[in-house]
């Protein structure tokens, strides 16, 4: 890299080629080019609007920037190896197109407020895309749940069977997680959508700019009130990475369950060929690569969040070159979340089939109805703790005898406590166990049906 940089006039010697490569960000911040062009067009219009440059010059700049946009979209814009970053690459090409007037674009602007603007425009756009993908993911969850209101599945605590639940209820738990993710991104958007443009390098500018004018052109809700804060703030990126990490947590939890459910030990779901792979040595294998990759990629997003926190923790005001390191992790996190949402949505919609007969069997082969025996006694006046202790002994005795609760004779029940009657068998049937939990937010069929209606209304708004 031997050509002069825009800032090189103060220096007596050229930048060492290895240092130039180390310093350059064009290899990754080219991702921001569309946003850099949009922000620069708004800046050019503002310069003309305030009389800092002429209207004709403003029009030339806007047109030249639009030409670069078209060149980029057509694959014809190729920044040279001497381009330090996307900002210099655009300015260099603009000057080639419109001549010396292109050198006026950077009036009253620093790369510090410029890159902050670009990054916010990029992230604002990506957040909307992720929110749309979340809605699609939620929609698929509801499509499946609506078919399985009365399909029962074992519910677990400590990965031990606890109580049976409606499969729809189980899926709605993930819907609610995704809803919080969707809302959280909306919260982040409000702090992303603040304009730093016009903050300059750190202290503002001597030119009579109109920051509100550019903010309006770029659809920002407000402007930074402090120029030092405006150029050095990356809270918005950290907040996004926190939200992205939580999205991946939720996807990873679902992925883990799909992996378990598809195993021979569970056999709750069948993975279809379109969303599974095989083994290079074991011909019988069908591997759950999609959920495994989602589970694995979660660590990438966590890592980018941690990296950003470490970058920011010791930075004095205002801009520091460390902030160049905010982008690759941010870009990768955005791409990882979008790809993971898409993959899990496809897996649910096209690659997964619940084995309803196996699920029906699974909810009858354990003691997950034991709580309902205690509830049965409590409803008949027996103190719950006394009933709880009694049922614990019954379970212990039944296990020793190789029986389930449903296998006990009525005489055996009544020997345990006279409150037991013939209706105990209905009370502890899996279907009744689920139906009886009719409290708001519970797994009872009536409540689940109401929850599905409410959830559908949420995403249809």
From Swiss-Prot:
Annotated InterPro entries: Arg_succ_lyase_C, Argininosuccinate_lyase, Fumarase/histidase_N, Fumarate_lyase_CS, Fumarate_lyase_fam, Fumarate_lyase_N, L-Aspartase-like
- SUPFAM superfamilies in alphabetical order: L-aspartase-like
NCBIfam families associated with the record: argH
Q: What class of enzyme is it?
A: lyase
The protein's matches in PROSITE patterns, at most eight in alphabetical order, are given as:
FUMARATE_LYASES (PS00163)
Organism lineage = Bacteria, Bacillati, Cyanobacteriota, Cyanophyceae, Nostocales
- Per the UniProt entry, what species is this protein from, by scientific name? Nostoc punctiforme (strain ATCC 29133 / PCC 73102)
Which pathway is this protein engaged in? Amino-acid biosynthesis; L-arginine biosynthesis; L-arginine from L-ornithine and carbamoyl phosphate: step 3/3
What protein family is recorded?
Answer: Belongs to the lyase 1 family. Argininosuccinate lyase subfamily.
Q: Which Gene3D superfamilies match?
A: Fumarase/aspartase (C-terminal domain), Fumarase/aspartase (Central domain), Fumarase/aspartase (N-terminal domain)
State any single GO MF term.
Answer: argininosuccinate lyase activity
User: Catalyzes what?
Assistant: 2-(N(omega)-L-arginino)succinate = fumarate + L-arginine
Q: How is this protein named in the record?
A: Argininosuccinate lyase
Q: Name one GO cellular component term.
A: cytosol
Q: List, alphabetically, the PANTHER family matched.
A: ARGININOSUCCINATE LYASE
The EC designation for this entry is 4.3.2.1
Q: Report any one BP term from Gene Ontology.
A: arginine biosynthetic process via ornithine
Origin superkingdom? Bacteria
Q: Where in the cell is it found?
A: Cytoplasm
Outline the subunit composition: Homotetramer.
The entry's keywords: Amino-acid biosynthesis, Arginine biosynthesis, Cytoplasm, Lyase
